[in-house]
Amino acid sequence: MKISPQAMNWMGARELLAMWRPVSEAGADQARQWPVLSEAAWVEERRCCLLLDEALEGGLVEGSVLGDLLRELPSLAGALASLQAGGGAETALLFRIKQVLFAVLELLPKIAAVAGYPLVASLAVREAYAVLHAAGDPAARFVLSAGRSPALTEARAEEVAGRRALLQARGAGGSAAELEVLQRSHEQRRQRLLEVEGQVLALVADALRSHAATIIEASAWVMELDLRLSKCLLRRAWKGCWPEPAATLEVAEGWHPVVAARLVGRGGGFVSQSFALPAGVSMLTGANMGGKSVALQLAGLVLLCGASGLPAPARSATFMRVDFVEVLAGQEQGSRHGLSSFGSEVMAWRSLLERSGSGFVLADEPARTTSPADGAALLEGLISAVAARGWHGWFATHFGEVGQGVAASAWAVRGLREIASEEGAAPEGSLAALESLMDYRLVPADGAAASDALRVAAQLGLGEEVLSIARRVRASVESGTNRSS
C-alpha cells in the first residue's frame, strides 16, 4: 500500500510509529520504514503475533526477559555484506555476529514454549557460534584467543617480551643507542603480531563464511521476534486489537493515540469513536471543531496499521486491502507554488484521479476554498468520480446535501450538547468549555447536517456584536430557503 509522506504527517502516522518501539538496532531500523506486508507475509505475521501475544498473556514467556536479551543486539547488515564479499576479518564485525548468535541460542529455548512459533535450527546456529567461540572465551563476546593458533601464541609472547625489555631499559637509564635497538626490535615484533592476528582472523572469517546462510537466517529471526514482541507490547499498552481484513472499514471504540496523548497531557480527556464504512464512498458531516478530522485520521491509521500487521487503537477493527491511501487536506499551502488555495485543491484532485489500482480516499472538507455553490457542485463531481473508479473513501464536509445519491453511508458528529451552567464549570470563551459541551461521538446521519458554527463561536468567546448580526442573517437565509422550497 502506497501513501505519501504528506498524508502520513497529516494522519499523525509518524508520531504513532514512534510509539512502536523495537529494542534492537536492527528492529528499530526496520520499524522506521513502516513495512507494509504482502498478503501472504501478512497472514504469517498475524499468526506469529497472535501466538506470541497469547503466550505473553498466559505467562508462557516474559516480555521483560526477552527484551533484555534483544536490547543490546546490533544490526548485522554491514557485517553480513562484508562477510559475503570476502571480508569480515575484523574483530568488531565478528564480535557483532557472535552477539547475535549468542542471543539466538539464549532465546530459542524460551520461544520454544510458544507452540507453533517458527524457530531456526539450533544445531546449525551452534555450529556457526562454535567458529567464533574458543574454550575459555566470554560467552557473548568475540576475542582472538591465543589458543586459536600456536603462531599467535608465539607472536604474542615475543611482543610481550620485547615490550618488557624496552621498559626495563628505559627504567635502568639505558643509552640512546641501546634504547633505539630495543625500540626497533619491539616494533618488528608488534608488526609480526598484527600480521599473525590478521591471518588468524582471516581463517576465522573463512570458516564462518560457510555458515553465512545460517547467520542470515538467525539474524532475520531475532529481528522479527523483536518486531513482533514490540507489536504485542504496544497492543497491550493500548488495550487495542489486531485488525482483521474485510470488505468494510469498521472501528469499535477507537481513538487516535497521538491526539489522546495531547489531550491527556493538558489535563483533558478523549472520547472514543465508532463507525462502520461499507465499500464505496461514505460522508461525514458535523460541527466545526467536532472531531471530523480526527475521525478521518483514525480511519487512515487503522488502514495503515492493518496493512502493516500492527495493532490498532480500538476495541475491534476491520480494514480494507487497497493499493493506496490518498488524503485530500491542507492544500491551502499551494500558493507557494504560484497557485491559489483553490488552484492547489484542483491540482490535487487531478493528480488523484490519474492514479490506478484500488484506493481509499480521505477528504477533509474538500472544495472549501471556493464559493459554497461551486464547492458543493465540484464536490459532488469528485465523489462521483471516486465512486466510478471503484475506490472507497470518507469525505468530511459541511455540504450536507452532497453525495446523497452516491454515498454508501453517511455519518455525523453529534455536536454541541445543551448543558445547564454548573458551578465550577470551565468559563465561557475557553477551549475547555467547548470541549465539555461537544459530543464527539459519531452517529449515522439522518437528514441535513447540523449547523453549530455560531454556537461554537459563542463558546469560544466571540462577542454579541458579531453574533447577533450573524443570527439575523442566518435566520433570513433559512427563511428564504424554506419559502423557495
Could you say what each language-model-derived stretch is?
Residues 1-160, 218-221:
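Conserved amphipathic alpha-helical "coupling/scaffold" segments
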Residues 78, 102-105, 136-260:
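Conserved P-loop NTPase architecture
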Residues 51, 75, 79, 203-207, ...:
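A general alpha-helix detector
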Residues 84, 107-114, 232-239, 309-311, ...:
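Short helix-capping/linker segments at secondary-structure and domain boundaries
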Residues 53, 77-80, 98-101, 105, ...:
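Short, well-ordered alpha-helical packing segments
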Residues 58-59, 204-209, 282-286, 365:
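Glycine- and acidic
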Residues 238, 245-485:
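ATPase nucleotide-binding head domains, primarily ABC-like/P-loop NTPase cores
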Residues 37-44, 68, 89, 96, ...:
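Catalytic cores of large soluble enzymes that bind and process phosphate-bearing ligands
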